[in-house]
Amino acid sequence: MDFRKTFLLFSLPFLFSGIFAQNKAINQNDSAGRKTGIWETYYESGRVKSRGTFNVGHPVGELTKYYPGGIVQAVMNFDETGRISYVKMFYETGNLASEGKYIDQKKDSVWNYFSTYDKRKAVSETYQMGKKHGLSYKYYVGGSPSEMHEWQNNLKNGKWEQYYENDQVRIAGGFVADSLNGAFVSYNPDGSLSITGSYQMGAMHGTWTYYSETGEEEFSVEYIDGRMLPNAEMDKRIDEFSKKVKDIIGDIDEIENPENF
C-alpha cells in the first residue's frame, strides 16, 4: 500500500476534527451564560468585525476591531478585570487616529489625536471618567502648541492661551463655565501689546485699550455688559477695530468633534 495514501487516509479524520474543534471553541458561553474564550463578530459580508478573548463575560488582553474592508480600526488591550483598556484607533488608511485610556468604557487620562494627512499629533486632551478635565492642547504642524485650554467637568474653566509658532504668547485669557471671563490680553508677534481688556461671563466689560503694531497705545473704549459706551474716536475706526478683535479671537473653536475618534 502507498504509505502516503495510508497517512492521508488516517490523518484526514483528525485534520477535520481539529478544524471542527477550533470552530466549536469560538463564541462560547460558560455555564452561567457569560462569554468565554475567543469571540468573533462578523459583517454581513462574512468578514471579521471584531476578535478578542473573554473571561467570565468581559474582555481580557487584546481585542481588535476591523473596518468592513479588513483594515484594523482599533486595538484595545484590557486588564484582567475588563474595566481598564489602552486603545489605539486607526483611520481606514491605516494611519493612527487616536490613542488613550478607557475606564469602564469612558475616556480617562491623556488622549492624543493625530492628523489623517501628515500623521502628526494635532490635539491632546485630558479626561476624567468620560469628561474633559485638565489641560487640552492644539499643535502646529511643527509640533509646538498653538492653543491651551483648562477644563473642569467638561467645561472650559480656567486658563486659556494661544501661541505664535515661535512659542510667544498670542492671547492670554480665561473661562468660567464655558464663557470668557476676566482679563484678556493679546500680543503682537514681537511680544508687544495689541489689545487689553476684560470679559464678564462672555461679554466685553470695562476698559479696552488698543495698541499699534509697535505696541504704542492708540486709544481706549469702555464697555458695560458687551455694550460699548459712546466714543468719538472709536466711531471713526469701528470697522477697523471690530475686524481686529474678530481676527484675534476667531481661532478659539475646538477641532471638529475629536470625540468621534
Where does each model-flagged region fall?
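Bacterial Sec-dependent N-terminal signal peptides
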Residues: 1-26
